[in-house]
């Protein structure tokens, strides 16, 4: 009796992205790998987007959730900011490439006129609002600054203006939002850019499909850096 050998289905890959700047700046990297996203998440209500490659799809998630989707295998790979990865901890993730996209910086800012340097020098205990609690805690601990951290999910600039906090820790790109709210940067914490993150199991099981995409991303990111 002749045995019929079934041909294996191509391995589908799922890429996790967040809307906005990271999505827009990832598109050229995908195109360098020969992949085009066929739908716009800004105009579509769909959370799963198809691409020109039938075996690659994109899921749209919150920026802070990208590492979690990749960690647990709901996505094979994703793009996330260094800020998000530091808060997540990076467990279960392979981070092979700094893509040099969505660049900004993480800084401490205060209301214009607040003498931050003197407060720190005098050992004052400062209240700080941020959504980057883990990173802020490590930063201030390393400097020996006493702080009470308050976690917010947005509108950090409002904190010092209404007396909720003395300072904020947030991402800064041009600084225009700070200036519009009479805040000034007083301390630079780190430079931020977005990284490619890959599920460790997927890297082993789907290496043949993933490797060409990873290589294309790396080459394209080097050209743009």
Curated annotation (Swiss-Prot):
Record-annotated disulphide pairs: none
Stated name of the protein: ATP phosphoribosyltransferase
Subcellular location: Cytoplasm
Keywords: Amino-acid biosynthesis, ATP-binding, Cytoplasm, Glycosyltransferase, Histidine biosynthesis, Nucleotide-binding, Transferase
Entry keyword annotation includes Protease: no
Enzyme Commission no: 2.4.2.17
Entry GO MF terms: ATP binding; ATP phosphoribosyltransferase activity
Assembly and interaction partners: Heteromultimer composed of HisG and HisZ subunits.
Catalytic reactions on record: 1-(5-phospho-beta-D-ribosyl)-ATP + diphosphate = 5-phospho-alpha-D-ribose 1-diphosphate + ATP
Name of a matching Pfam family: HisG
Organism: Herminiimonas arsenicoxydans
